[in-house]
């Protein structure tokens, strides 16, 4: 799960001339909030599933997991294990119930050791540099509207060095 600050209407300060403050942000009187980018990556194929949700609560994460499992099942992927960090949303009872309900073994990374979950961490970095901050967006809705197109590119067109220059979809 990666948190991204929302883009204000009219565009954010990242691409503004002189990197000028726009008057919105965490310390302003009108904060915009964040989008919680919930991410699932298939270990073998690197097929990615992402949703932008409003929070990272256990109930929200469990709902995301159900939708991610349906996505992977539709692609012919059988999920046997899930590797997560130790966030409270992944340690919640409702999240554990969903994994048990689907017969999935839940494994957690060592605390303060993000390298253990390297594929997801690397995907988060790619998502930031190639989609979220790749160009100026005029609003948060515009940025989120481009997410499905970027995921299609990532899953079906982009070649991955870690899997022999293949696309994730070709490894299913």
Describe the residue ranges of each PLM region.
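Basic, flexible linker segments flanking DNA-binding modules
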Residues: 1-16, 88, 96-98, 111-114, ...
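Extended, low-complexity cationic-aromatic segments
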Residues: 1-42
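Active-site beta-loop-alpha junctions of metal-dependent nucleic acid enzymes
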Residues: 20, 27, 33-37, 51-75
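Short, surface-exposed connector motifs at secondary-structure boundaries
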Residues: 75-81
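RNase H-like polynucleotidyl transferase catalytic core
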Residues: 81-86, 101-119, 135-138
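C-terminal domain-tail junction helix/linker
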Residues: 100-104, 126-172
């Amino acid at each position: 799960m990666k948190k991204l600050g929302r883009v204000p209407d009219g565009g954010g300060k990242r691409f503004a001339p002189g990197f000028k403050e726009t008057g919105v942000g965490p310390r302003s009187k009108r904060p915009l909030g964040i989008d919680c980018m919930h991410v699932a990556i298939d270990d073998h194929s690197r097929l990615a599933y992402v949703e932008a949700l409003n929070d990272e609560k256990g109930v929200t994460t469990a709902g995301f997991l159900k939708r991610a499992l349906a996505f992977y099942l539709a692609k012919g992927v059988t999920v046997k294990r899930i590797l997560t960090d130790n966030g409270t949303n992944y340690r919640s009872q409702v999240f554990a119930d969903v994994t048990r309900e689907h017969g999935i073994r839940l494994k957690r990374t060592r605390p303060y050791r993000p390298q253990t979950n390297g594929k997801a961490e690397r995907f988060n970095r790619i998502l930031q540099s190639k989609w979220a901050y790749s160009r100026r967006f005029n609003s948060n809705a515009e940025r989120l509207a481009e997410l499905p197109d970027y995921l299609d590119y990532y899953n079906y067109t982009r070649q991955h060095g870690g899997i022999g220059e293949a696309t994730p979809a070709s490894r299913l």
